[in-house]
């Protein structure tokens, strides 16, 4: 038993010595002593350590995200980035406003028809689905009408350049 614990103690001491010799040096731990200088470090005339160009990463090496961020900062100045962020924020707020207005309208419609906005358990879902399909049809039809109005307006403004002409074999080619 004492022999085993003696061997363990010797192994422990050996491990501590090896660990301290590898990781315990002042240069490895990053500690700097004024009188001790590592042999592999270069100094200028004033005694200041020079930057090691071989151990540091080159500017192009890094994660793809940081490279993309650096390229973005290089090609787009801060003023343009601020303008772009402002435009994005404005569009995002507009979309959020539309979504909240749509939700508010849905709650008003549900309250006006006597239902709950979530479509509670006592309410049957058939009128809700019918209203939903009617809304989809109305939305699609109104979008179609708007497109036709835009085409009519463009035809009136641009004249013959916008009108489609029939080519050989009946294919239609827009004239823009």
Swiss-Prot record:
Gene Ontology terms describing biological process: adenylate cyclase-activating G protein-coupled receptor signaling pathway; adenylate cyclase-modulating G protein-coupled receptor signaling pathway; insulin secretion; neuron projection development; neuropeptide signaling pathway; positive regulation of cytosolic calcium ion concentration; positive regulation of ERK1 and ERK2 cascade; positive regulation of gene expression
Gene3D superfamilies: 6.10.250.590
UniProt-annotated stretches for the region Disordered: 36-62, 115-134
Signal peptide, first to last residue: 1-24
One Pfam family recorded for the sequence: Hormone_2
Positions where Lysine amide occurs in the chain: 169
Compartments reported by the entry: Secreted
Positions of the pro-segment in this chain: 25-80, 173-176
Keyword terms: Amidation, Cleavage on pair of basic residues, Hormone, Neurogenesis, Secreted, Signal
GO molecular function, one term: neuropeptide hormone activity
Annotated segments matching region Important for receptor binding: 150-158
Gene Ontology annotations for the cellular component aspect, listed alphabetically: extracellular region; neuron projection; perikaryon
In-chain residues carrying the UniProt-annotated modification Leucine amide: 158
Family: Belongs to the glucagon family.
Role noted for this protein: PACAP is a neuropeptide involved in diverse array of physiological processes through activating the PACAP subfamily of class B1 G protein-coupled receptors: VIP receptor 1 (VIPR1), VIP receptor 2 (VIPR2), and PACAP type I receptor (ADCYAP1R1). Exerts neuroprotective and general cytoprotective effects due to anti-apoptotic, anti-inflammatory, and antioxidant actions. Promotes neuron projection development through the RAPGEF2/Rap1/B-Raf/ERK pathway. In chromaffin cells, induces long-lasting increase of intracellular calcium concentrations and neuroendocrine secretion.
Protein name: Pituitary adenylate cyclase-activating polypeptide
Lineage summary: Eukaryota, Metazoa, Chordata, Craniata, Vertebrata
Name of the gene this protein is made from: ADCYAP1
């Amino acid at each position: 038993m004492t022999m085993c614990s003696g061997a363990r103690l010797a192994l422990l001491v050996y491990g501590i010595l090896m660990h301290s010799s590898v990781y315990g040096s002042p240069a490895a731990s990053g500690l700097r002593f004024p009188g001790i200088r590592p042999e592999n470090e270069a100094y200028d005339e004033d005694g200041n350590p020079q930057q090691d160009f071989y151990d540091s990463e080159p500017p192009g090496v890094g994660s793809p995200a940081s490279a993309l961020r650096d390229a973005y900062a290089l090609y787009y100045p801060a003023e343009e980035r601020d303008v772009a962020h402002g435009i994005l924020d404005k569009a995002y707020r507009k979309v959020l406003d539309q979504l909240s207005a749509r939700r508010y309208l849905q709650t008003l419609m549900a309250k006006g028809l006597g239902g709950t906005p979530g479509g509670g358990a006592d309410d049957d879902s058939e009128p809700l689905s019918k209203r939903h399909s009617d809304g989809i049809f109305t939305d699609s039809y109104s979008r179609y009408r708007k497109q036709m109005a835009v085409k009519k307006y463009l035809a009136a403004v641009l004249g013959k350049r916008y009108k489609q002409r029939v080519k050989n074999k009946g294919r239609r080619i827009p004239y823009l």
